[in-house]
Amino acid sequence: MLVILLGAPGAGKGTQAEYIADRYKLTHVSTGDILRASIKKGTELGKKAKEYLDRGDLVPDEVVVKIVEERLKEPDCQTGALLDGFPRTVEQADTLDQVLADMGSDVDAVLYIDVSEEELISRLTGRRICRDCGATYHLKFNPPQVRNVCDQCGGELYQREDDSMETVKQRIKVYREQTEPLIDKYRKKELLYPVDGDKEIEQVFKQIEEILDQKSPNSGG
């Protein structure tokens, strides 16, 4: 089973992806994780990606597509995969269709976690990360015991540049402009399943279960 997970920055895709991968025995393929690892290592690909991300723009197709194609061909993806963060544009989706056709595969379902803009901004601008251990906090949902100090290691908490109000609004704008045509594409192909992402995490996953239980042999009953 191949599932695509769509949703704006801050929609909670990462959390839901973990639940989905565990429940349905799918390999979680996160382009965000792959890109962040490349940036941290300072690879050529990482440097290119960082330039775009720092501006609040999307990473170019040719960079992302190559990563995803290679990842999907690895052995752990042969029994099923969950694509998180890709495709983001109709062009990427068309390329993915070609890649999957060459592999004798196809998309089974596209989950779209729909969250209001107000909620997205609240979630993203409140995020804080520990400089030392990487632990993540949120000023509203998961605040540290002492302001700007990590509960786990005592390190300093900071706001990532791409979590600032200005960059967040730009990220959402870019997402809407580039990804909404993609949503229309999958709706027309009758592969799109909207999920109300404004709800609590457990309620969001319950909606997803109702969709995927009808499609997967690995739902666990």
Regions found by a protein language model. Give the residues of each.
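Glycine-rich phosphate-binding loop of ATP-dependent small-molecule kinases
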Residues: 1-221
